Amino acid sequence: MRLWVTGYRSYELGTFGDKDPKIKVIKYALHQTLKEQVDNGLEWVITGAQLGIEQWTIEVVADMKKDYPQLKLAVMLPFKQFGSQWSEDNQAKLQKLIAQSDFSESVSTKPFQSPIQLKNYQKFMLAHTDGALFFYDTEFEGKTIFDFQVVTKYQTQTPYPLVQVDMYQLQEYASELEEKMNENRYDY
């Protein structure tokens, strides 16, 4: 099974820096959710490289590969020179994350020219995955709304499972993580 993973950007979640405690909860939720998917036949995680859920997904999957060496990671970029407007630190981090993947390529062979490249990226992701995992809550809109709308429209024509982790579930994961940390049972 191939899974498209995306979700909120870091600024949409109000995270600041790599040490923000919210990131620990999100990575824990990613790990738990992806572990469940691996147990159900997940072979490939296919994600983008946006700052936020997508980059944290890359980090989590790279770490999970120690316990699940069969798990593969593809980082797909919507266009060439993706991230070139970012700060030098974020560009360096992007290159480091891409290096951790089993496969990475740009869907469009040209630098950003128009929003059609983003639509083509969405079509590519749908065509090359068997389902999706979105860290997204319809009550707290963000840029993922565009991917969410494409997936829900696609679902009207094609069986395509979508697992959504919403704010309520993130709070549940936060409580679970806190409990494990208090009992020194934190395993991620």
Curated annotation (Swiss-Prot):
InterPro entries registered for this protein in UniProt: YspA (IPR010697)
Entry coiled-coil feature ranges: none
Top-rank taxon: Bacteria
UniProt xrefs under NCBIfam families: PRK13660.1
PANTHER family reported in the protein's UniProt record: UPF0398 PROTEIN SPR0331, UPF0398 PROTEIN YPSA
Family of the protein in this entry: Belongs to the UPF0398 family.
Protein name in UniProt: UPF0398 protein LEUM_0652
